[in-house]
Swiss-Prot record:
SUPFAM superfamilies: LDH C-terminal domain-like, NAD(P)-binding Rossmann-fold domains. Keywords: NAD, Oxidoreductase, Tricarboxylic acid cycle. It catalyses: (S)-malate + NAD(+) = oxaloacetate + NADH + H(+). The gene is mdh. GO terms for molecular function: L-lactate dehydrogenase activity; L-malate dehydrogenase (NAD+) activity. The active site is at 176 (proton acceptor). Pfam families: Ldh_1_C (PF02866), Ldh_1_N (PF00056). Coiled coil: none annotated. Its EC number is 1.1.1.37. Catalyzes the reversible oxidation of malate to oxaloacetate. This is Malate dehydrogenase.
Amino acid sequence: MARKKIALIGSGMIGGTLAHMIGLKELGDVVLFDIEEGMPQGKALDIAESSPVDGFDVSLTGANVYEAIEGADVVIVTAGVARKPGMSRDDLLGINLKVMEQVGAGIKKYASSAFVICITNPLDAMVWALQKFSGLPKQKVVGMAGVLDSARFRYFLSKEFKVSVKDVTAFVLGGHGDSMVPLVRYSTVGGISLPDLVKMGWTTQEKIDQIIQRVRNGGAEIVGLLKTGSAFYAPAASAISMAEAYLKDIKRVVPVATYLSGEYGVKDTYVGVPVVLGAGGVERVIEIDLDKKERSAFEQSVNAVKKLCEACIAIAPCLK
């Protein structure tokens, strides 16, 4: 049986990390694409030369033309401008929307059967635009945000409680931005809910609130520390987990930016909610009960995403 083909659009820090992780997991053959000549070829060769040491057998190639992604089973899109200190994800909209138009056309022509994972910011608006530009089925085009935001939430909680990250479950709803909604009520440590852990005296509500704010500021915190770039290890790992769920039909329950057509009372918008991810792409959107406060925060987040989509339409009326 032929190996799966995974195309990576954008060969920056996330793209290179994705390629290496795919090789280590032997998920499939890799095509690194970038408009900058030499960049994808150099990274592909460098990673390929590590394969005898790490003991993996996959093909890694670099390319500057979209023909190279033809027939890809999975396409992961990281192309675009990354944040710099002082910038919000929303500041990238105008530049990265034009990139999504080009990428969407390339996917539409050469990889129309692929499962597409978008990482480019501002995430929710970019994946919404990418689906429209590519014309691919909505359940086959998703955004990577919730897995990353939830991983940050889980990590910070594990540090607070001094327990293994494996025993912490948590997830984040809404857009990938300052209005994201970390759900405390649905988050657990060893099956014990966070509100119960507060009652048990393991932590305080004040500390939980501080963690929530740190989750919302997670990307900016790393941008501020790096100064010349943004996060790439955790975003890449998050996207790989999604690609693996699709390629191996694992039926993972994960939060992703997916198209909503009435779920949660939201229509024609991509926003982060829990889904079942398998060989059919988004196979099911999971609607959880939200209390009044959670619902209000979620609606605020959705409205922030809708404003970004309206800004996209103002730039590219064809998206309407």
